Amino acid sequence: MDEFHRCGKEDSFWQQCFLYPLFFQEDLYAISHDHYLDVSSSSRPMEHLSSNDQLSFLTVKRLIGQIRQQNNSIVLFVNCDPNPLADRKKSFYSESVLEALTLVLEVPFSIWSKYSVEGMNESKSFRSIHSIFPFLEDKFPHSNSILDARIPYYIHPEILVRTFRRWIRDAPSLHPLRSVLYEYRNSPDNLQRSIIVVPRVNTRFFLFLWNYYVCECESILFSRLKRSSHSRSLTHGSLPQRTHFHRKIKHIIIFSRRNSLKSIWSLKDPKIHYVRYGERPIIAIKGAHLLVKKCRYYLLIFRQFYFHLWSEPYRVCSHQLSKNCSSSPGYFLRVRMNPILVRTKMLDELFIADLITDEIDPIVPIVPIIGLLATEKFCDISGRPISKLSWTSLTDDDILDRFDQIWRNLFHYYSGSFDRDGLYRIKYILSLSCAKTLACKHKSTIRVVRKELGPELFKKSFSKEREFYSLRFSSKAAARSQRERIWHSDIPQINPLANSWQKIQDLKIENLFDQ
C-alpha cells in the first residue's frame, strides 16, 4: 500500500493500479481483523467477546480460494464461522472480509482525493462544522438567495460500481464490491431494493461509500459550475475585515486592448458559494430570480441524468434571504442592514460617511424547540414544564448531568444569535422540569426539594453561560457581548434537536409539494 501512495503522484498510475492481487494477501486480513476487534471491543464488553473472535489463517485461505471462483464470489455474506454468543446478522469472518475490501478501495480513493484537492487552489474544503459559522458571516451577506438541497440516500448499486470504474480500471477488483452491494440490495430487510448511503451508519464500509458518493457529487458539480461561469475566481485575501474588502472587488471592468472598439469584459462574479453540513448542501447565490431558478433546475437535472435518479422537486428548495427561512442547520436566517459610521480626516477636513453593510442574523427557533421538548416529555405543547418520568430511576447527579448536557448543547449551539432572550425561556423549562423530576423521584414537592438541597440544586447545572462570561469578559465587555455574536468552538456536531426540527421542516415542505 505504501508503494501505491509513493507512486500516486503519477497522473495515470492511480487510475491503472491493479488492486485485485491485494485481496489474496494474508496481511490485509490481519489488519482488518485487528481493526474489527478494536471497533467491537469499544462497542461490546469484554465478556461478550468469545474465543471464536480469533483469526484463523486456515479459514482466511479457504475464503480466498472461494473468492477466486466467480460463482462463489457471493461468499462475503455467508456464515463461515457463526458465533452463537453474538446476536449479529453477519458472521465474524464476513465482517473481516468486508473490512479488507474497504481497505483495498480506500487506497486509490485517498490518492485521488488528495491530489484532486491540491490541484484546486481556488476552492476551499470545509471539513468541520466550525467552518459553517464563518461561512454564514462572510459569504451569506453577499447573496440574496439560497438553495437548500438534500443529497439522496437511495442509489442503485450498479451506479456506484460504474462511478468506481471511472478511476479504477482494474475491473476484477470491483467484483467483490458488486457482490457485496447486490447482496445487501437483495436482503429481506431492504424494501427499497437499492443501496442506502447514509453518513450515520457506524461501519467503515458504509462510511467509505458515503464519503466517496459525496466526493463524486461535489467534484462533478464544481467542474460543471466552473465551466458554466465565464468569470474567473477572485480571492479576497486574508484581511481583518474581509467582508468590506470582498465588496470592493465585487465588480472589475477590464478594457480589451486587442480591439479598437470599446469592447468591455465585465468580470462580474456570480457569487455562488457552497457549504455542506452532513447530507444537506447549501448554495448561496447573488443574482436575479431567473438565475436562482436555473441553478435549481440544473441541480435537479444533474442528479437525474448523472446518477440516474428521479429527484423530487422538494429536495431542492430556493429561499430569499430578505425573508425568514429555515435553511441553516437549526436556525431561521435573515439579512439585516448594519450601519457603520466612518470618519475620514484628510488634511484639515473631516469627512463623515455612513457605511451600510449586510449582516446575517440567525434567529433561534423557540417554538420548534419547545415542540421538540414536548415530544421528549420535558413539557407540554404549550411550554409548561413537566417531570421526566423515565429518568426518576437515575441518581440525582445523573439527572442533573443530563439536564445540564441538554442546556449546554443548546446554549453553545445558539450562542451565535443576536437575540438570545428566547433561550432563557428554554432554560426555565429545563430547570423547572429538572426540579419536578427530582421531586417526583423523592415523592415530594418542588419546595421541599429546594429546601433540602438548597443552593446545591442548580450549582452544578445551568451555570455554563455565567462561567463563560465571567472568565472571558469584564463587566463592560460582558454587556457588549449581549449585542455581539459569539460562536463556541466546542460544538462536536450539529445539535440533535436541530436535526429533528429540520426533519419536521422537510416533512412540511413535502406536504406542500404533494398538495
From Swiss-Prot:
The gene is matK. Keywords: Chloroplast, mRNA processing, Plastid, RNA-binding, tRNA processing. GO terms for molecular function: RNA binding. This is Maturase K. Usually encoded in the trnK tRNA gene intron. Probably assists in splicing its own and other chloroplast group II introns. It comes from Pinus leiophylla. InterPro entries: Domain_X, Maturase_MatK, Maturase_MatK_N. GO terms for biological process: mRNA processing; RNA splicing; tRNA processing. GO terms for cellular component: chloroplast. PANTHER family: MATURASE K (PTHR34811:SF1). Belongs to the intron maturase 2 family. MatK subfamily.
